[in-house]
Curated annotation (Swiss-Prot):
<dbReference type="GO" id="GO:0004729">
    <property type="term" value="F:oxygen-dependent protoporphyrinogen oxidase activity"/>
</dbReference>
<feature type="binding site">
    <location>
        <position position="49"/>
    </location>
    <ligand>
        <name>FAD</name>
    </ligand>
</feature>
<feature type="binding site">
    <location>
        <position position="409"/>
    </location>
    <ligand>
        <name>FAD</name>
    </ligand>
</feature>
<feature type="binding site">
    <location>
        <begin position="448"/>
        <end position="450"/>
    </location>
    <ligand>
        <name>FAD</name>
    </ligand>
</feature>
<dbReference type="GO" id="GO:0005886">
    <property type="term" value="C:plasma membrane"/>
</dbReference>
<dbReference type="InterPro" id="IPR050464">
    <property type="entry name" value="Zeta_carotene_desat/Oxidored"/>
</dbReference>
<feature type="binding site">
    <location>
        <begin position="41"/>
        <end position="42"/>
    </location>
    <ligand>
        <name>FAD</name>
    </ligand>
</feature>
<comment type="subunit">
    <text>Monomer.</text>
</comment>
<dbReference type="InterPro" id="IPR036188">
    <property type="entry name" value="FAD/NAD-bd_sf"/>
</dbReference>
<dbReference type="GO" id="GO:0005737">
    <property type="term" value="C:cytoplasm"/>
</dbReference>
<dbReference type="InterPro" id="IPR004572">
    <property type="entry name" value="Protoporphyrinogen_oxidase"/>
</dbReference>
<keyword id="KW-0285">Flavoprotein</keyword>
<dbReference type="InterPro" id="IPR002937">
    <property type="entry name" value="Amino_oxidase"/>
</dbReference>
<dbReference type="Pfam" id="PF01593">
    <property type="entry name" value="Amino_oxidase"/>
</dbReference>
<keyword id="KW-0350">Heme biosynthesis</keyword>
<keyword id="KW-0560">Oxidoreductase</keyword>
<protein>
    <recommendedName>
        <fullName>Coproporphyrinogen III oxidase</fullName>
        <ecNumber>1.3.3.15</ecNumber>
    </recommendedName>
</protein>
Amino acid sequence: MSDGKKHVVIIGGGITGLAAAFYMEKEIKEKNLPLELTLVEASPRVGGKIQTVKKDGYIIERGPDSFLERKKSAPQLVKDLGLEHLLVNNATGQSYVLVNRTLHPMPKGAVMGIPTKIAPFVSTGLFSLSGKARAAMDFILPASKTKDDQSLGEFFRRRVGDEVVENLIEPLLSGIYAGDIDKLSLMSTFPQFYQTEQKHRSLILGMKKTRPQGSGQQLTAKKQGQFQTLSTGLQTLVEEIEKQLKLTKVYKGTKVTKLSHSGSCYSLELDNGVTLDADSVIVTAPHKAAAGMLSELPAISHLKNMHSTSVANVALGFPEGSVQMEHEGTGFVISRNSDFAITACTWTNKKWPHAAPEGKTLLRAYVGKAGDESIVDLSDNDIINIVLEDLKKVMNINGEPEMTCVTRWHESMPQYHVGHKQRIKELREALASAYPGVYMTGASFEGVGIPDCIDQGKAAVSDALTYLFS
């Protein structure tokens, strides 16, 4: 490398790659490291799924709309960028579960669908008497035998029965991953539930004991919620990182086609004809793209065989009087058993008042789920019409929306199927042996939320610097 400096290349400019570049630059400046840094992004823009549209006074998030405040890496990144004055918490309100065509309030005290307060669970209309009785079996059932992994569905059905799973737990948990809970890995998504069961035997009693005071549904009594975003839209986060990357050479609209050994370092072939040499590489690209770069590594088959779900979301803006809701709240999720194409809906102007102009209603509906992704390929008009038809079953909507925005994310939701953790472990061990100094990380590996991705980017920086300078 020039002037005897080491060279690190980051592949992928989503939030994982951007966080890696930002914190790598911080290390270079603070420790005066002899290091050059390059970031290569396949699309014309950085930021990945973080994308904000401002239209007719509305602030529309095409991808994630927020992050959990208690996961400290995201608020910390915002502060490190000097954007803390833009942080806003969600307004709290009642959330609902739609079963058939009835909206049921989320039972108070439910943590990811697991009851920690008995009275609201007993009185809810979400479950039949027999469904409640089956869930109560959790109090006397033994803990499951030690297992390396199992599906979310297998675990929760054994603890609380099918009805609670299908009417409450499944709509909440599968919505995060757009996945099938009977395939999703417990240990790669919510291992804390397994650990709670193993320690306390009863999942309900264990959750009740370990639940932080003032969390979950208790927040509905407060004005501020547990999620945060930026008042100008989350894309501000991306733009500010890009603006502050002073030491990083950034290629946009450029793909890495191959990563191979080149003497004691690595050679990266780009589709623009440029070849980069690197001493260490951090790969944060989606797993299918990452697999294509290292096709000669046998363990890369784990990534090639990993499925991703396609989803879409639709933002709809109305004059306030055009939408009348029987229920006050911030939104609802939908039981898979219900005859609806949408999987959830956020009453965005209630949850994020800054996102809609005064006197306007902003709804955001979600479509596409594991096993039912064809709707994503329909035209904008067809998707909008299907969404409106579903929403009109739940609320009174008069007239057409004055603003619409359809966003498709093809093969965007990596599926952590049973055994995912072990497969990733095997891949990383093979990578460390055959390609020391090359690190794969990001949403396809250990968490899809913004804080999870930031954490993974920071961990990769630590690994790369240890490899290069220890």
